[in-house]
UniProtKB/Swiss-Prot annotation:
DNA-binding region: 97-191
Tissues/organs with expression: Expression begins in the newly forming dorsal mesoderm and is maintained during gastrulation at the dorsal blastopore lip (Spemann organizer). At the early neurula stages, expressed in a row of cells along the dorsal midline that are destined to become the fllor plate of the neural tube. At late neurula, expressed within the anterior and posterior poles of the embryo. After neural closure, expression is detected only in the tailtip, the otic vesicle and at the midbrain/hindbrain boundary.
Signal peptide boundaries: none
GO cellular component: nucleus
GO biological process entries: negative regulation of DNA-templated transcription
InterPro entries membership: Fork_head_dom, FOX_domain-containing, TF_fork_head_CS_1, TF_fork_head_CS_2, WH-like_DNA-bd_sf, WH_DNA-bd_sf
Keywords: DNA-binding, Nucleus, Repressor, Transcription, Transcription regulation
Protein name: Forkhead box protein D5
Subcellular location per the Swiss-Prot or TrEMBL entry: Nucleus
Length: 352
């Protein structure tokens, strides 16, 4: 009893907060270390750890239970929450994104179709049914499929037939893009496919078949223009020739624009030499004037010098003539005192 009184005399209540400071430092070390230190310093539970009913406080119980839990986990090998972890892992593994690009997915969808063509909705349905990852995230990647169809040359748009009801155009693969993937594996593309426009639009013209100006994606050379378009030549009397396959149209009332003033004056001088009296030889080349004056010498294209017969310049009523184009690629057809020139009159469509 004397020992207890002495201990009570030497220890006043102000010394107890020191224990709380030690507990704070132990919490920094960790929960397991705090329990081991308490068991080392306190052989018996103190009054503060005992409740009013004489039961250990929850902090003490937690230390004892932690030891039993750790031993139980080591023996059983599994924790209480172990069944929930594998199920969550399986769910995550099922939603892993497939290792295929959008081009590969579109190619898979088109190749599995019976007619080797599908609409945008058909492609999306195939991808959703084949890969659960895209099924759960359907609205987000549909625009990516649409952009890949439009921006890649390996996909060709096919318009829907008039008698085939439905919405949207069909999409198919370019025949030249069959070797786009290595050994038929969709994991990697060999190279990006680019369509050659000259082969795709081969022998096709957008506008005006006689002229190659509107041929898409091709370089037009001057020699090709002269070879593919009908050309009428107009030259000085010594070297002027007329194409024989062009038929004259004497009943056309159309004025021909002369490209060069010197050539125009040459025609006027020739008319003055062949017809001194212009008032008598002037004619409008109409059927009425021919019927009214049957006895007068009628100037026609046959009476002129055959080298100066230029009625072939008017070939069709709905055609017109461009100004003469200077071309030095072929032989000289125009010659005068100063030099040699050649004029080609190229027919231009769509003029009225």
């Amino acid at each position: 009893m004397s020992l207890s009184q002495e201990s009570g005399a030497h220890h006043d209540p102000q010394d107890y907060p020191v224990v709380s400071d030690e507990e704070d430092e132990i919490d920094i070390l960790g929960e397991d270390d705090s329990c081991s230190l308490k068991s080392h310093f306190y052989l018996q539970p103190t009054h503060s750890e005992m409740g009013d009913s004489g039961i250990l406080s929850p902090s003490k119980l937690s230390c004892t239970e932690s030891e039993s839990d750790s031993s139980g986990e080591s023996e059983g090998g599994t924790s209480k929450d172990s069944p929930a972890t594998p199920s969550g892992g399986k769910a995550k593994r099922a939603l892993v994104k497939p290792p295929y690009s959008y081009i590969a997915l579109i190619t898979m969808a088109i190749l599995q179709s019976p007619h080797k063509k599908l609409t945008l909705s058909g492609i999306c349905d195939f991808i959703s049914s084949k890969f659960p990852y895209y099924k759960d995230k359907f609205p987000a990647w549909q625009n990516s499929i649409r952009h890949n169809l439009s921006l890649n040359d390996c996909f060709i748009k096919i318009p829907r037939e008039p008698g085939n009801p439905g919405k949207g155009n069909y999409w198919t693969l370019d025949p030249a893009s069959e070797d786009m993937f290595d050994n038929g594996s969709f994991l990697r593309r060999r190279k990006r496919f680019k369509r050659h426009q000259q082969e795709f639009f081969k022998d096709g013209l957008v506008m005006y078949n006689p002229l190659p100006y509107y041929r898409p994606y091709s370089t037009i050379q001057p020699q090709q223009v002269l070879q593919q378009t009908p050309v009428a030549c107009m030259a000085i009397p010594e070297n002027l020739t007329m194409p024989t396959h062009l038929a004259p149209y004497p009943d056309i009332k159309r004025k021909v624009p002369y490209p060069d003033q010197g050539v125009h004056r040459g025609f006027e001088a020739l008319d003055a030499d062949n017809h001194p009296n212009k008032s008598q030889s002037k004619c409008s080349f109409s059927i009425e004037n021919i019927m009214r004056k049957p006895k007068e010498p009628e100037p026609s294209f046959s009476t002129f010098n055959p080298h100066w017969n230029y009625n072939h310049l008017l070939q069709r009523p709905n055609s017109c003539l461009l100004p003469a184009v200077l071309n030095l690629s072929t032989g000289p057809l125009l010659s005068n005192a100063q030099g040699t020139r050649q004029y080609n009159l190229i027919k231009f469509p769509g003029c009225y």
